[in-house]
Amino acid sequence: EVALRAAAFIRQIDRLPLLVKSAPGFLVNAVLGPYMLEAMRVVDEGLSPETVDEAMLAFGMPMGPIALVDIVGLDVAMAAGRGLAGAGVEPPKCLVERFNTGCLGKKSGKGFYDYSTGKPERRVAGIVPAGLAERLIAPLLERTQQLVDAGIVADADLADAGVIFGTGFAPFTGGPLNYVKTRNKD
């Protein structure tokens, strides 16, 4: 009964409720974490934050993963990453270096981007390597499937809707699991 009342309230505030079982990060944060982690690993490998973000904007995401880390806050990303990744997973060097110098993202005026003018100052993105968007979303796709397989989310359609509405995942795809299903048919 409590869940039904909570869902009714969420509808009243014009949001879409999605009942999920309790798990670290539930659905949205559980799938965003691996996606943002992979994006920062790519930055560690030498690609610019602008290039990483451009790849995902071109894919159809509303915002790049590096810009998202800046908005969430590097301190929050660091803490959430530890909680979601588990023991033994090292945080990306680019995150640790910025965090250790007090660059916490938009809230501190500097993170991966400089916000001293109020808006992020970005350099021109480099050439986006072929396959970069696919590499970046692969952990998100995998984690979404794991959550369905574990029964955290009741089924693939609900997971797809939750990830689209909760993260802005490129809506034209029909959601991450639909994207995998239709991509594999080609």
Feature-to-residue mapping (PLM):
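N-terminal glycine-rich phosphate-binding loop for ADP-containing cofactors
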Residues: 1-186
